[in-house]
Amino acid sequence: MAPPIEVSTKSYVEKHVSLPTLNERILSSMSHRSVAAHPWHDLEIGPEAPIIFNCVVEIGKGSKVKYELDKTTGLIKVDRILYSSVVYPHNYGFIPRTLCEDSDPIDVLVIMQEPVIPGCFLRAKAIGLMPMIDQGEKDDKIIAVCADDPEYRHYNDISELPPHRMAEIRRFFEDYKKNENKEVAVNDFLPATAAYDAVQHSMDLYADYVVENLRR
């Protein structure tokens, strides 16, 4: 078992996270289903969210294949092969039991030493937010580190990363759709507190979504 991670943001959780979360209470009533587990809806986000949370990996570091979650089946499908001569610089996926305005779970890029297979999940720690506009629509990304990687778990804010690492991430997202004639704009990276707020907001949107569906 990995040694405990010291996070200096305990006060943030106490102020912004009510336990038990609405997500957990509502979804527990939906657990008596004879269907396969769905990584978006059935995997818990984790008790330390929005700082440390579970992340489902869709795309492994170094991959040119754009995998994504099939929201109907819960399986990971091949969406396309990237048109540009680039590969994902880090593992990429989503945070379960979250929801954004585009009706998808919130995206997260996880910095760690090794690539991992699509469909697995890991514990990630938010260190920053990358505001992004994809074809005119908001598509922000949480930047995180693997909470169980001894090389990266001590990072608490994106400002602690080497400047080259941040430039690498920015350049990938600016370029990876250029050969599809799709415009992507990446704004300045925001600190860890902005990432916590974004994750918490997506958790709240998901909880509201579940409530509305239970009322139908």
UniProtKB/Swiss-Prot annotation:
Q: Which Pfam families match?
A: Pyrophosphatase
Its EC top class is hydrolase
Q: Name one GO biological process term.
A: phosphate-containing compound metabolic process
Residues annotated as binding substrate: 66, 80, 92, 176
Q: What is its main location?
A: cytoplasm
Residues found modified as Phosphoserine: 18
Instruction: Show the catalytic activity.
Output: diphosphate + H2O = 2 phosphate + H(+)
The coenzyme or cofactor needed here is: Mg(2+)
Where Mg(2+) 2 is bound, by residue? Answer: 107
InterPro entries attached to this UniProt entry = Pyrophosphatase (IPR008162), Pyrophosphatase_sf (IPR036649)
Signal peptide region: none
Q: Which tissues express it?
A: Ubiquitous, excepted in pollen. Very low expression in cork, xylem and hypocotyls.
Q: Where in the cell is it found?
A: Cytoplasm
Keywords (alphabetical) are: Cytoplasm, Hydrolase, Magnesium, Metal-binding, Phosphoprotein
Catalytic residue list: 88 (proton donor)
Activity regulation statement: Inhibited by Zn(2+), Ca(2+), Ba(2+), Fe(2+), Co(2+), Cu(2+), Eu(2+), Eu(3+) and Mn(2+).
Q: What would be one Gene Ontology cellular-component term for the protein? A: nucleoplasm
Question: Which residues participate in Mg(2+) 1 binding?
Answer: 102, 107, 139
GO MF entry, a single one: inorganic diphosphate phosphatase activity
> What subunit structure does UniProt give?
Monomer.
Similarity-based family: Belongs to the PPase family.
Q: What does this protein do?
A: Catalyzes the irreversible hydrolysis of pyrophosphate (PPi) to phosphate. The MgPPi(2-) complex binds to the enzyme only after a free Mg(2+) ion has bound. No activity with glycerol-3-phosphate, glucose-6-phosphate, p-nitrophenylphosphate, ADP, NADP(+), NAD(+),NADH, NADPH or phosphoribosyl pyrophosphate as substrates.
Q: What is this protein called?
A: Soluble inorganic pyrophosphatase 4
- Tell me the organism: Arabidopsis thaliana
Q: What is the lineage of its organism?
A: Eukaryota, Viridiplantae, Streptophyta, Embryophyta, Tracheophyta
Originating gene = PPA4
